[in-house]
């Protein structure tokens, strides 16, 4: 069972994907999990920047540019969740 943070991030990414791509993804929006590859949702580097911006706003975190470069290695939803979790832990 996914925790609250995971569900919130999946929901945020789901909304972004739906707004950007409509229903034109290879994964049904209701089937997004932590294993879902970002590319299967049509999220490229620009889309990832949008995701990061939305997550900054949602959680009040700041993603430094040098950190954002490291985030280019994010491959799936679970990677995004763990990266955000790490930043939230630092904020406390």
UniProtKB/Swiss-Prot annotation:
It comes from Rhizobium leguminosarum bv. viciae. Pfam families: PP-binding (PF00550). The modification O-(pantetheine 4'-phosphoryl)serine is found at residue 45. Proposed to synthesize nod factor fatty acyl chain. Involved in trans-2,trans-4,trans-6,cis-11-octadecatetraenoic acid biosynthesis. InterPro entries: ACP-like_sf, PP-bd_ACP, Ppantetheine_attach_site. Residues 4-88 form the Carrier domain. Keywords: Nodulation, Phosphopantetheine, Phosphoprotein, Plasmid. Transmembrane segments: none annotated. This is Nodulation protein F. It comes from the Bacteria. 4'-phosphopantetheine is transferred from CoA to a specific serine of apo-NodF.
């Amino acid at each position: 069972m996914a925790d609250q943070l995971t569900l919130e991030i999946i929901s945020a990414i789901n909304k972004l994907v739906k707004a950007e791509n409509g229903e034109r993804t290879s994964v049904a929006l209701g089937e997004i999990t932590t294993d879902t590859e970002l590319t299967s949702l049509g999220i490229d580097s620009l889309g990832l920047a949008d995701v990061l911006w939305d997550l900054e706003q949602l959680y009040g975190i700041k993603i430094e540019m040098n950190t954002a470069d490291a985030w280019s290695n994010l491959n799936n939803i679970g990677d995004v969740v763990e990266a955000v979790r790490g930043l939230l832990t630092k904020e406390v």
